[in-house]
């Protein structure tokens, strides 16, 4: 998340962005639990819990458990849509790990194996829909290129950042052809240097850059 300082909590809210007379204004709140969520951290900086909101209500919770060296060991997920807990378990072997999600009945859904080599990682996930391979390249600890390969083709995301490590542009390619982009501008920061207000732009059907979302973050510290 690229957060600075000893963060205790992070609350993210997203709104529709509206262009009006050369300016961008905030519209209705987005009812999307991937865009409106809350994170809680311990004093080591590890995420201990998340909450996802839709329509102003919490619809999904996650709790994170780490081993003695700070590596994720288990994630427990609860949702108003499940009949019980879903879990993810991790098995570590040096710079490799296996990630296994289970459904609410305890059945293993898929298996994902990830290996890191210097500034690269490769993950292979195998499940009921076949296999998917993810390859990521990093620069200064930040992902700059992510490639997803599956039976339906290849998708590539390319990331650009500002001097503070905030993403400013994401380009998307599908089977080698350009398929859109997103650009982010940051206008408000808190005392620790973390952004609290940004505008997200996307490519319209005609290829022009148009405002898409306004995102706000509320951050508390230890």
For each predicted feature, which ranges?
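Buried hydrophobic residues that stabilize the cores of well-folded domains
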Residues: 1-222
């Amino acid at each position: 998340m690229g957060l600075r300082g000893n963060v205790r909590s992070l609350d993210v809210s997203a709104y529709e962005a509206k262009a009006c007379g050369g300016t961008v204004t905030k519209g209705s709140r987005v009812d999307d639990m991937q865009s409106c969520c809350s994170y809680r951290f311990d004093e080591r900086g590890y995420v201990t819990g998340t909450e996802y909101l839709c329509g102003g209500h919490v619809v999904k919770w996650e709790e994170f458990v780490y081993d003695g060296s700070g590596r994720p060991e288990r994630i427990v997920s609860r949702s108003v849509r499940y009949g019980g807990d879903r879990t993810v378990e991790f098995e570590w072997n040096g710079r490799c790990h296996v990630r296994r999600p289970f459904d609410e009945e305890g059945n293993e859904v898929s298996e994902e194996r990830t290996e890191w080599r210097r500034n690269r990682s490769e993950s292979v996930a195998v499940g009921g829909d076949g296999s998917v391979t993810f390859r990521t390249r990093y620069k200064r600890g930040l992902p700059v290129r992510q490639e997803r390969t599956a039976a339906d083709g290849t998708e590539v995301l390319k990331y650009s950042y500002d001097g503070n490590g905030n993403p400013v542009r994401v380009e998307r390619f599908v089977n080698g052809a350009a398929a859109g982009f997103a650009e982010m501008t940051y206008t408000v920061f808190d005392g620790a240097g973390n952004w609290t207000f940004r505008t997200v732009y996307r490519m319209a059907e005609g290829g022009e850059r148009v405002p898409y979302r306004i995102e706000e973050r509320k951050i508390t510290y230890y």
